[in-house]
């Protein structure tokens, strides 16, 4: 099994607590308003805490149409979440799972920095192509910025 690690940081003027709430705890209510059409459908099994499963269907026409996420850890006071992508065509047939750790850290100016670490567990010696990682990073940034704009406006 191969392992690849990718890190991403995005800064915001939105305070850490508000960003974590909007980006993680209330994302299923905010995202349809902030980025209509980003998801086609979301089926949730669980209360949002550890063990919750989300099956996400994305719009047709993109390189990825399905993914299933499992919440592995959640610290509401520390503004962190651990979740894994465990199924769907997002795994491209050569990834076993993607472990993600996301933390929202307060900054000195009252804003926040969202830090994400993704660990790709690949089958055999498969390697996730850099263009796939860049595409995922661009999608994450787009959704983050949509949520950020929504939080600033509301």
Curated annotation (Swiss-Prot):
Keywords of this entry: Allergen, Pathogenesis-related protein, Plant defense, Stress response
Tissue specificity: Expressed in roots.
Induction profile: Up-regulated by abiotic stress (wounding) in transgenic Dau c 1.01 or Dau c 1.02 gene-silenced carrot roots, and to a lesser extent in wild-type roots. Up-regulated slightly in transgenic Dau c 1.01 or Dau c 1.02 gene-silenced carrot roots in response to biotic stress (infection with A.radicina).
CDD domains noted in UniProt: Bet_v1-like
Temperature remarks: Melting temperature is 57.7 and 80.3 degrees Celsius at pH 7 and pH 3, respectively. Not heat stable, unfolds at 95 degrees Celsius at pH 3. Refolds partially at physiological pH 7, but not at pH 3, after being heated to 95 degrees Celsius and cooled down back to 25 degrees Celsius.
Gene Ontology terms: cellular component: cytoplasm; nucleus
Field pH dependence: Stable at pH 3 and 25 degrees Celsius.
Alphabetized Pfam families for the sequence: Bet_v_1
InterPro entries membership: Bet_v_I/MLP, Bet_v_I_allergen, Plant_def-hormone_signal, START-like_dom_sf
Gene Ontology MF: a single term: abscisic acid binding
The family this protein is said to belong to: Belongs to the BetVI family.
Protein name per Swiss-Prot or TrEMBL: Dau c 1 isoallergen Dau c 1.0301
Organism in which the protein naturally occurs: Daucus carota
